[in-house]
Structure formats: C-alpha cells, structure tokens
C-alpha cells in the first residue's frame, strides 16, 4: 500500500469492502480528475478496483484546481510574447554566480537536448507563473513526464 488510509477512508474501505470486493491497484503515482474545464490532481492517491466492474475507488487529498482554458490561454500568450520579444523569464533573473546569493550550486539535471518533449516554450510558461530556477523547472517537467500542469503544481508546493 502506498500510504496508510485515514480513519474515514478506512471506514469507507471496510464498509464497501464487505459489500463488494476491493482489489488494490499497485504502484499508483498520479491521478488527475477533469471536471469540465478544471483539472484536479489527487495527492497521495490510493486506488482500488471494484471486482467484477470497470470502476475504481480512489482515496487521496484533492489538490488545487487548475482552470485548463485559462492555462491554455496563458500558454498561448506566453508563446506569442516570446516570439515578439526575447525578454528574460523569472529563471533568467537568477544570478549566474550562485555564490553571490550565498546559495549552493543546484544539482544539474541531465536531459537529452534532442528530447522533443522538453520545449523552451513550456519552460518559459512555467517560469512566467512560478518563481523557480531553470534547473528546478526542468527537473519538475522530467519528474512529471513533461506534463506542464503537474510540473507547475510540484513547483508551487
């Protein structure tokens, strides 16, 4: 099991488990729910398959909502403005010499430069919304399998 169930979750599990068979879905890393134009991430998900059906019971904390239309508009605006001007994003504001800030050098992220999943537009979009270093943005993108919304949510925690 990925994590222990809370008291309320355990009660629901026992109640439903007695009536229908529940089979844990192993190695669940992320669950997202899209309701109309809003995407929610389920934090620390635990999922069970209800035997004899195609249904899944999900336990976890509902993350902050993300308006997909608004995010798409911001992304398109970011691409348009980056084509118009090559101004710095938030990650460009960070000093090139980390000793100036008294900050240790961040761990370098090794990413294949020919990997088409990593785009400069995604990095610029995230940097316009979240104050983070370029390396942190790339690391969040890689860890979230290049999902911009998930990467932004990881960086805002």
From Swiss-Prot:
Record-annotated NAC-A/B domain positions: 6-71
What broad class describes the main subcellular location of this protein?
Answer: cytoplasm
**Where is the UBA domain positioned along the sequence?**
118-157
User: Could you tell me the keywords of this UniProt record?
Assistant: Cytoplasm, Nucleus, Protein transport, Transport
The places in or outside the cell where this protein is found are:
Cytoplasm; Nucleus
What CDD domains does the entry give? UBA_NAC_like
Residue numbers spanned by region Disordered: 81-116
Q: Where is the composition biased (Basic and acidic residues)?
A: 81-107
What task does this protein carry out?
A: May be involved in mitochondrial protein import by enhancing productive ribosome interactions with the outer mitochondrial membrane and blocks the inappropriate interaction of ribosomes translating non-secretory nascent polypeptides with translocation sites in the membrane of the endoplasmic reticulum. EGD2 may also be involved in transcription regulation.
Give the family, as the similarity comment puts it: Belongs to the NAC-alpha family.
* Name the UniProt record assigns to this protein: Nascent polypeptide-associated complex subunit alpha
* Organism for this UniProt entry: Encephalitozoon cuniculi (strain GB-M1) (Microsporidian parasite)
């Amino acid at each position: 099991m990925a994590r222990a169930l809370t008291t309320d979750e355990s009660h629901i599990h026992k109640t439903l488990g007695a009536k229908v068979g529940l089979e844990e879905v192993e190695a669940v890393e992320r669950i997202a729910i899209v309701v109309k134009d809003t995407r929610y991430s389920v934090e620390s998900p635990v999922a069970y398959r209800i035997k004899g059906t195609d249904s899944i019971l999900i336990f976890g904390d509902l993350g902050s909502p993300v308006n997909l239309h608004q995010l798409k508009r911001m992304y398109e605006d970011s691409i348009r403005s980056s084509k118009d001007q090559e101004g710095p994003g938030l990650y460009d504001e960070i000093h090139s010499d980390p000793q100036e800030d008294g900050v240790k050098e961040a761990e370098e992220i090794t990413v294949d430069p020919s990997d088409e999943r990593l785009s400069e537009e995604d990095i610029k979009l995230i940097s316009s919304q979240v104050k983070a270093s370029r390396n942190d943005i790339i690391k969040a993108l890689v860890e979230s399998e290049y999902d911009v919304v998930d990467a932004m949510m990881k960086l805002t925690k």
